Swiss-Prot record:
Presence of the UniProt keyword Cell cycle in the record: no
A GO cellular component annotation in the UniProt record: virion component
Record key words, sorted: Virion
Native organism taxonomy: Viruses, Riboviria, Orthornavirae, Duplornaviricota, Resentoviricetes
Listed name of the protein: Core protein VP3
Organism of this sequence: Epizootic hemorrhagic disease virus 1 (EHDV-1)
SUPFAM superfamilies for this protein: Reovirus inner layer core protein p3
Length: 899
């Protein structure tokens, strides 16, 4: 059954798509906004780079990016394992009571990263960040349900969880020594402990110091329980739920507070908005994220058609501009412009409108005049924010003046002013001064902000950075809205003055139309106020300090870090926007998870900033390896290892190609941070990495001529028992008065004279040491039970090449080559002769390395388990370990109590 013509039921807005009449069914305004904003950004960027370099200007998939961020929230940066990693292993020699104990952490670390080249600083940065991330990953583990066994009524640790591998040495030990080892293993008693009212197992094991520092920091983070942080988070979520009309669900509180549950809070709420807004060139990306995560789905509804029929089109013959446009139907493109208008209204100051150049519509005076009238009632132009540009405001003023001077009904007295500016005249019998409707961005006269306080501060908002509340048309967003009754009897200054001016100009029919449209108009802006102040309030909302200066900067033409997005609309779309209202029909699906998305994003940004701050110090600490380094190198290195969704958000507007060094260094120096478990572990990893030997990087590499030992085998049994080996690892640095420091300048000077090799030969003949600069080198560890390859034995701590070109000789010197620490274990048989290891010509080795870390030690049987001095805490098998970060969601979205 069809609705009666006077039914007070809003109807969706039809539009022409080609030659077919179509209707909206809840279009995703967020996706449309992304496309339009990106279209504008692409247009500007393509002009910037037309004569320079190519930039990827494809529109990113925002939904895919947000899904990726949500997956980051579900990822855990720690591992739950039953046994720690093996930290020490033993290399067996022919001796029965002497072995080489190897710290396996340094072995694994030496394999991480690429070769360092002083001419490619980006590789050095990438290597360092990979090593730091490797350290953080190795140490971030939680012990749970460790394997144990019973020994004479005592619970003892299984040998696999002690961190020392003794399996390789047991077969070669004597029975007495095996009994000694077994006695120590049987003494690894598991003690019962209590951490934060939870029962745990405590035992002593072995662990590399660097890995243990990360593990200990993680364990301390968990043991701190963070009850106060959780209370603050829950309280804040309740505040946010009240602001956004959502219910915070506390179902998970019953579960995780059970005594058999260990809970981990890896993220903190709320996110620090300053972290999000400090990112270089972030305003458009944050605007898009705000739209995508918060903007509700809605339809365009029309007012009661009887309003126009009893006012504008009541006569059979209608010649007025409003009557001409009343029966028109928008095209798909024009309805897109209507969406742009509502986007600008929902994001005042951030999105502003301008009139597109369309000669066809400019030739239609009726369209321009109608748009000039309703534009003054739809848009705000000061004093606190604006929806339109100065050019558009002036064009609307001209169009309004044309409408007032368009005498289609009767002659009205007009008295012109002296300036010739738009609206500089008095009209009507009462001589209404139309100057008050000319745009003035300082006072807001002539538009919706005229005589109103449309930005106010009331109760504290959940997000500290955005305390403003928008009040279009002086409507309080806390009011309940019922379309059938809301707006009746309401008014505001600009609307009243428009009615007075229309009556003075003899436009009684149009004045009657606007009187009847007032309730619909007030409902429209009441909905917009609610969407802005409730749904769109998030960490991605523009900070108040930046919002407050947008208008002033635009008026004076000053460029700041945050500039508005300008969207182009057509004249007639202003009329269609006035005749339609955006009605939310479904709240955003990601509204309840938006705080978690913000926290994950802010946490990742903080970790990236921490990495960049640490890398910015490297060039000052090690200038020889970073001669050609620039801040862009460590920026790219950190971006390379950052999660893809975070990089995609930062580059939503394809702005990374335009970030300069000033932007980077300014961001790195800002103090804003977002606390999280990941940041705590990252900072601890960098604290460990301050000693670069922990990353298997060293600058203590020397050139020294040393003869490879060739011992006589006079007593083979004693030789085997002592476990003879040779290494190029020094126990201490050489005497400083015997060391010659070769800087790049000295080496280049002698190379230019063609005397580098001769100079080094003289130093070697004097049995002195040469240290080539202070460059950091990657160190590898290798073990050999036979003669190492010649490329290792004869390796030099520098690369020196010469070539001739055009009659000139060029020399290339590089210091940052890989260095190998090798251990040569001598194995002999009883059948060997005394001179079996002696060669006629001795073998010389040229590279020596000194490191303070004891990577390899020769130990006796009694020292094999002496490294079991680290305290491990393991959660019992019947305890549950639960990461409650995913539970920190706002909860259930409430239906708006206004329909």
């Amino acid at each position: 059954m069809a609705d009666p013509p006077d039914a007070n039921v809003p109807k969706t807005s039809p539009y022409l798509k080609g030659d077919e009449l179509s209707s909206d069914s809840g279009p995703l305004l967020s996706i449309f906004a992304l496309q339009e904003i990106m279209q504008k950004v692409r247009q500007a960027q393509s002009e910037y780079v037309a004569a320079t370099k190519d930039v990827d200007l494809t529109v990113p998939d925002v939904q895919k990016i947000i899904d990726g961020v949500k997956e980051l929230a579900s990822e855990t940066i720690y591992k739950i394992v039953q046994k720690p990693i093996i930290s020490y292993r033993h290399v067996v020699m022919q001796s029965r009571d002497r072995f080489l104990r190897v710290d396996t952490y340094y072995e694994r670390m030496s394999e991480v990263g690429d070769k360092i080249d002083e001419n490619e600083p980006a590789k050095f940065y990438e290597t360092v960040i990979k090593k730091v991330r490797h350290l953080r990953t190795e140490g971030a583990f939680i012990l749970h349900n460790i394997p144990t066994k019973d020994h004479r009524g005592m619970e003892i640790a299984d040998p696999e969880i002690l961190g020392v591998d003794v399996k390789s040495i047991l077969p070669v030990l004597t029975a007495e020594h095996r009994a000694m080892i077994q006695h120590v293993l049987d003494g690894a008693i598991i003690e019962n402990g209590n951490i934060a009212t939870r029962d745990v197992d405590v035992y002593l094991g072995a662990c590399s110091e660097s890995v243990y520092r990360i593990y200990n920091r993680l364990q301390g983070y968990i043991e701190a329980v963070q009850l106060e942080e959780l209370r603050r988070t829950v309280t804040w979520l309740e505040r946010l739920g009240k602001r956004k009309r959502m219910t915070f669900s506390q179902e998970f509180l019953t579960d995780f507070r059970r005594v058999d549950t260990i809970w981990v809070l890896a993220l903190r709420l709320p996110a620090n908005p300053r972290v999000i807004w400090d990112v270089p060139r972030c305003s458009i990306a944050n605007l898009i994220m705000n739209i995508a995560t918060c903007l509700p789905t809605g339809d365009m509804f029309r007012p009661n058609p009887r309003i126009a029929s009893i006012t504008l089109t009541q006569r059979i013959t209608t010649t007025g501009p409003f009557a001409i446009l009343t029966g028109s139907t928008p095209t798909a493109q024009q309805l897109d412009d209507v969406r742009k208008i509502y986007l600008a209204l929902m994001f005042p100051g951030q999105i502003i409108l301008d009139l597109k150049i369309d000669p066809g519509e400019r030739m239609d005076p009726a369209v321009r005049m109608v748009a000039g009238v309703v534009g003054h009632l739809m848009f705000t132009a000061g004093p606190r924010f604006t929806n339109i540009t100065q050019n558009m405001a002036r064009q609307l003023d001209i169009a309004l003046a044309d409408f007032l001077l368009y005498m289609y009904n009767t002659r009205i007295q007009v008295q012109y002013g002296p300036t010739g500016e738009p609206l500089d005249f008095r009209i009507g019998r009462g001589q209404y001064d139309c100057n008050v409707f000319r745009a003035n961005f300082q006072t807001g006269t002539g538009y919706n902000g005229w005589g109103l306080v449309d930005v106010e501060n009331r109760e504290p908002a959940p997000y500290d950075h955005a305390q403003r509340y928008i009040r279009y048309c002086n409507i309080d967003s806390r009011e309940l809205i019922h379309p059938a009754t809301f707006g009746i009897g309401m008014n505001y200054h600009c609307y009243n003055e428009m009615l007075r001016m229309l009556v003075a100009a003899g436009k009684d029919t149009e004045a009657a139309f606007f009187r009847n449209m007032l309730p619909f108009h007030m409902v429209r802006f009441a909905r917009i106020n609610q969407v802005i102040n409730e749904d769109l309030h998030s960490a991605f909302s523009m900070p108040d300090d930046q919002f407050n200066v947008l208008l002033a900067n635009m008026v004076v033409g000053q460029q700041e870090r945050v500039d508005p997005v300008i969207l182009d609309i057509s004249w007639i779309s202003i009329w269609y926007a006035f005749n339609r209202s955006f009605e939310p029909i479904r709240r955003n699906e990601m509204l309840e998870s938006a705080p978690l998305i913000e926290s994950v994003y802010a946490s990742e940004l903080t970790v990236m900033k921490t990495d960049m701050q640490q890398m910015a110090l490297l060039q000052r600490r090690f200038p020889d390896v970073l001669i050609e380094a620039r801040p862009t190198h460590f920026w790219k290195a950190v971006m390379e290892v950052s999660p893809e969704p975070v990089r995609a958000i930062m580059d939503l507007a394809h702005s990374h190609s335009f970030i300069n060094i000033r932007d980077m260094m300014r961001w790195i120096g800002l103090p804003s941070m977002q606390n999280s478990m990941k940041l705590v572990l990252e900072e601890e990893a960098w604290a460990v990495a301050n000693d670069f030997e922990e990353l298997m990087l060293t600058d203590q590499v020397y050139m020294y001529r040393d003869m490879l030992p060739e011992p006589r085998l006079d007593d083979i049994e004693r030789f085997r028992q002592e476990g003879f080996y040779y290494t190029n690892m020094l126990d201490g640095p050489p005497a400083i008065d015997r060391v010659v420091q070769y800087t790049y300048e000295v080496a280049r000077f002698e190379a230019n004279m063609g005397q580098l090799r001769a100079a080094l030969r003289r130093i070697m003949d004097d049995e002195r040491w040469v240290r080539f600069g202070g460059v950091l080198r990657t160190v590898r560890i290798k073990f050999f039970d036979s003669r190492p390859p010649e490329e290792i034995l004869q390796a030099l701590p520098f690369d020196y090449q010469t070539n001739e070109k055009g009659g000139l000789t060029y020399a290339t010197i590089k210091y940052a080559n890989d260095t190998t620490i090798y251990y040569l274990i001598y194995n002999v048989e009883y059948s060997n002769l005394p001179d079996s290891l002696v060669l006629i010509n001795p073998t010389y080795v040229m590279t020596k390395v000194f490191m303070n870390k004891r990577i390899v030690e020769r130990v006796r049987v009694g020292q094999a388990l002496a490294v079991m001095n680290k305290r491990f805490i393991a959660f019992k098998g019947k305890m549950r370990i639960m990461d409650i970060s995913q539970a920190l969601k706002v909860g259930t979205k409430l239906a708006a109590p206004t329909v």
